[in-house]
């Protein structure tokens, strides 16, 4: 049985090095691996001894914490219906029969959409308070940066198409978007911002060189969106440090997207994650491979901020945006005609929807290398609910 356990854990640890995979599981034996310190010797007394003091029971460890999520499995967390203008019909041939001025409930194209890519990279300082070489209470303080990419439907990219309102009356018409642009890609990069986490880990059961342990962790960060890219044929644009409207319904203010826009706020993403895990390790001299399972819930909430396409407040060369014409079977009409704006996408906007975990359970495999019972380096890979890699280097005082 011991040989089988050794084989399984060694294979898992070696496999973790061959594939790259926000919160690590960590080695369940970590509280008891470093039993000596660089400044103070470890204490191996009996906790029930009346002569033992808390000074004998407590020790400190510090080190580096690096966590690199290459693909977090996320989906949108939105309502089934979305409020916007009525959809154009086959009877709207030379422009809309009636320009949309009121919102109607339509099926939400963002409902249940999966994100194509979600990355997060964290570098932090690691501090742990150890009790009786069995329990750890720890925290991390550092910085994180992220990247999100998905189909434009996940971000409710919409615009107005086919309007018959002339440009001279457009600013006062209070029209709402009627077309969902679902065949495009939206990506965003966040800035590098402060991140922190807290947690606890306990070695619950030991038998020879095997250790069964559990941990609980919570992490939080609130990065701002540094750059937003919309890759769409009908309306392609990039915004550095985007701003938008929180809680605003259509129609947005006609100044939305211009430098004169008011009532906007910086686009930021509130990241929260909870995680509980159970893991088993087996010590083989300097190496302690382990394998674990975890349950986690993560959310990315940007307050459903609505961001408008950048545009000019006043037309220059008869245009306010660089959106192309979409002639289709018709033709591009001259300025001053009834449907002069019908062939270009107007009042384009998107919103940053709330996202959450698509899968809650995952596995982690890794190994810890201990030197002189004072220093340790842990390498870990996580799979199923995310592809992530983790590195932790620490020493005991």
UniProtKB/Swiss-Prot annotation:
Q: Which UniProt keywords apply?
A: Cell outer membrane, Cell shape, Disulfide bond, Ion transport, Membrane, Porin, Signal, Transmembrane, Transmembrane beta strand, Transport
Q: Give the protein name, as stated in the record.
A: Major outer membrane porin, serovar L3
Signal peptide stretch: 1-22
Q: Which Gene Ontology cellular-component terms appear in the entry?
A: cell outer membrane; pore complex
Its main localization is membrane
Q: Which GO terms describe its molecular function?
A: porin activity; structural molecule activity
Q: What does this protein do?
A: In elementary bodies (EBs, the infectious stage, which is able to survive outside the host cell) provides the structural integrity of the outer envelope through disulfide cross-links with the small cysteine-rich protein and the large cysteine-rich periplasmic protein. It has been described in publications as the Sarkosyl-insoluble COMC (Chlamydia outer membrane complex), and serves as the functional equivalent of peptidoglycan.
What membrane topology was assigned to this protein in its record? Answer: Multi-pass membrane protein
Compartments it resides in: Cell outer membrane
Membership in a protein family: Belongs to the chlamydial porin (CP) (TC 1.B.2) family.
For this entry, list what GO says about its biological process: monoatomic ion transport; regulation of cell shape
Record text on subunit structure and interactions:
Part of a disulfide cross-linked outer membrane complex (COMC) composed of the major outer membrane porin (MOMP), the small cysteine-rich protein (OmcA) and the large cysteine-rich periplasmic protein (OmcB).
What Pfam families does the record tag this protein with?
Chlam_OMP
């Amino acid at each position: 049985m011991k040989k089988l356990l050794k084989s399984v854990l060694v294979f898992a640890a070696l496999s973790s090095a061959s594939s790259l995979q926000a919160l690590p599981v960590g080695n369940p034996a970590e509280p008891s691996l470093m039993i000596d310190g660089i400044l103070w010797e470890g204490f191996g007394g009996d906790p029930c001894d009346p002569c033992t003091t808390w000074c004998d029971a407590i020790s400190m460890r510090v080190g580096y914490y690096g966590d690199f999520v290459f693909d977090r499995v996320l989906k949108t967390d939105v309502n089934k219906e979305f409020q916007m203008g009525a959809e154009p019909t086959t009877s709207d041939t030379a422009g809309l029969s009636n320009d949309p001025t009121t919102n109607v409930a339509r099926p939400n194209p963002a409902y249940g959409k999966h994100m194509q890519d979600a990355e997060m990279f964290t570098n932090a300082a690691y501090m742990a308070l150890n009790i009786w070489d069995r329990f750890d209470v720890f925290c991390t303080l550092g910085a994180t940066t992220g990247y999100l990419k998905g189909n434009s439907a996940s971000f409710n990219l919409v615009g107005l198409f086919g309007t018959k309102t002339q440009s001279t009356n457009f600013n006062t018409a209070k029209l709402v978007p009627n077309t969902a642009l679902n065949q495009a890609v939206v990506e965003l990069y966040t800035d590098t911002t402060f991140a922190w986490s807290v947690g606890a880990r306990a070695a619950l059961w030991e038998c020879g060189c095997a250790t069964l342990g559990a941990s609980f962790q919570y992490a939080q960060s609130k990065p701002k969106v540094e750059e937003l890219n919309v890759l769409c044929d009908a309306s392609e644009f990039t915004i550095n440090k985007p701003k938008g409207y929180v809680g605003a319904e259509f129609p947005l203010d006609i100044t939305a997207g211009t430098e004169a826009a008011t009532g906007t706020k910086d686009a930021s993403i509130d990241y929260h994650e909870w995680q509980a895990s159970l893991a088993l390790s087996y010590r083989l001299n300097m190496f302690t491979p382990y394998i674990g399972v975890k349950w986690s819930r993560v959310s990315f909430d940007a307050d459903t901020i609505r961001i408008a396409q950048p545009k000019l407040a006043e037309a220059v060369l008869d245009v306010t945006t660089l959106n192309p014409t979409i002639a289709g079977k018709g033709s591009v009409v001259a300025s001053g005609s009834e449907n002069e704006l019908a062939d270009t996408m107007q009042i384009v906007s998107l919103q940053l929807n709330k996202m959450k975990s698509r899968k809650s359970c995952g596995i982690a495999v890794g190994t810890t290398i201990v030197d002189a019972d004072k220093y340790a380096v842990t390498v870990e890979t996580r799979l199923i609910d995310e592809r992530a890699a983790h590195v932790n280097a620490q020493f005991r005082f």
